[in-house]
Amino acid sequence: MHHIVRSAAIVAASVLTLSLASGAAMAGSAQEEANRKTVLAFYEKGLNQKDADAALAYVGDRYVQHNPNAADGPDGFRKFIGFLREKFPNSHSEIKRSFVDGDYVILHVHAVREPGSRGNAIVDIFKLENGKVVEHWDVVQPIPEIPANNNTMF
């Protein structure tokens, strides 16, 4: 009898451990999906709709910018969006894919500043804290007229 009780306790502990691990994974996935949705909304409002104030609703109490052509903070973001609105009012960025790793969201983007042009391939990396964007990095690569291969950049 003692052996049966001990075996049942081991099975119960194993099931509880697996349940807790599964719940933690689902919670992480839910938070990661929330982070993805935050960044996608931020990107759409800012880069496509060119509405800096609407985009800044998704930004935390700081915004650290690693792009050397844009300043830190909400004012730097407003200036960048103002530049896009003034110089490239018809620009559009199409997010080809997104990846999430905890508090980091990575976007692979086809950005076209002038309709009809080839545009740029961009990888944007955003860091979130408490569900808000607080940091941004990007790398930009012009799409060549004549590529060395038949693969696309997307």
Where are these regions (language model features)?
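Bacterial N-terminal signal peptides that target proteins for export
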Residues: 1-12
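C-terminal and inter-domain tail/linker signature
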Residues: 18, 22-154
